Amino acid sequence: MSGQTPSWLKSSILFSKKVSEATKAQIKTVFPVSDFKPNTMHLGHPLLISHRDKSKAYNFIYQKFKSRLTLTKANLLNHAGRLTLIQSVFASIPIYYMNNMLFSKKLLAKITAIVRTFWWHGIQKDQHKKPMHYRSWDAICKTKNEGGLGIRKLELVNKGMLINTAWRLVYDSNSIVAKIIKAKYFPYASLWTAPTYVPKSTFWASILSIRHHLEKHVTIQLIEGNTSIWNQPWCPMWKDMHNLLNLEQTNYQIPDKISDLWMTNTKEWDACKITTLFGQQTLDVLLQIPLIPGDGPDILCWKPASSGICSSKSAYRVLATEEAANNPPACIPVQVLQILHKVWPDKSIQPRVKTFAWRLLRLALGTASRVHKKIPSIHEACSRCGNIEDEKHLFFECSFARAVWFASSIGLRVDALPSLERGLHIQIATILQQGPSQATTGMIFSIMWCLWKARNDLRFNNLNWSIDRVLHEAMAIDNAYCLPIQPGYESQHTHTPPPISNWPIPGATNAANTHMEDELKIFCDASVCLQNSPGSNQIGIGILVLSKSTRNVSSASFFQVAIRRTLEPLEAEARALLLGAKLAVALNLQVATLLTDNQVLASVIQARSPRTQPGHWSLRPVIAEFQELASKR
């Protein structure tokens, strides 16, 4: 006992409806606290959600978003600043709450509307008209590689964090929270088979709503076989094991754990028992499941992550990928993506110019012609020459733009560019490919950015920029962010994988191989032909054996093997290395050097810790078998 006493003024008590008044009074004589109020908050979170509409209970999050916009003077930020604020501040406000509750679509729509409006227009006070959005929110929430801005969808963030919470309940089943949840909601089952019909809290209802997402992307790697056959996702047909069980047979007892399906004192499937209990089809499936040598409990793995550990970030990516597969995005020209892939990683380009480049290439600028289509009262004519103002006219066809390009250090003649009918991105790509050395990505978009600023000043402030001012501002913007590249930076990134060190085999004899030298090099490689349909990859393994006496490759020994099992490329490389090790053992080699062109695989073998450092969770069975093979020699 610490001897400390609670603060009774800050404490309150909540009784169940079935507690009598006499019992309440008796308890209050011991604990002098007030009754609990439904609107009590703790650390900014409501302790009791009494509203039938959960969005009302969490309406304070919506108010936080609105107040944060006002405090940060959002209207003073350009689009780059708004993007940074959205990604850093706005995304962090609801994180604590999203870990514990699945927000309603209504609440998420209200919050998303704030963020979306803020990105396009900032905060417009006393404006009740719906602002114009030139690109869909789905397009903006795509990754930068896919042509978006990388803003995360709140709905997917919410589900991803709940998936991570559910993962922790299963992965760390000995934690206090996991034990409490199990005792309350599934004392005689697992999270995977927990019933959904029992009375549940908001937290547990949220976990159950995303359970199928977690179940779809986990697997269990078998070591000791201590996993239950009936309520764990250990094989593709685990949910049907009860239906497949042959209750009429009397030769075997009904098994409980996976190890009960192994032969006695071995880690090999008991084919006769499995066939008798569950049928031949079940046996065919189980024979494809690798068994990891060694001791230790079975390992739950999150398949999308190389570490096998689930995180909210990894879960978000999985959900985003699934959503994109169900809702294919609009086709974006290849040239647009190629230009954006040059713009985003270029540290010499200012962030405001980068976001402008995105709006320009994705046709999301508020040009007069685009605004006129939605608001006919706004004229679509150019403020300088009176022609229809779109991107092509504003940046290349207008006489002012032509003069700016020709007077710039690029010395560009717009007449020499391809037809503008093919799209603005074609002209920009042509300048980047065929222009002089001064036509850098940063300079091109800095000039276009200043042309856009000049247009806005003339249209809204009646300020006319000169050609010299446009060029001077563009030069200043382009030079301001030119960061010096440290010498030798690129040389630090090499891709030559080190070979695996010599692998000694103690106790081996060399009598049967006197014609071969001790120093033998075994090159192991795998080839994977990826197919469109999942589970149909074609795998081939090649082994090349070279000794000191081998003068050229044509006289070396070469083995090739086709694998019927479907493997991922990394696991196929590991299988090739394991086959090379088995070949060395079969040849009774004293010393052999195994070589692979896979850096991850080489590092894992040298680390000698397949359980804790497998490199990739799928490598754990192969690496464990490799090390067991070495230890037995």
Regions found by a protein language model. Give the residues of each.
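A helix-boundary/hinge signal
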Residues: 1-579, 583-596, 600-611, 619-633
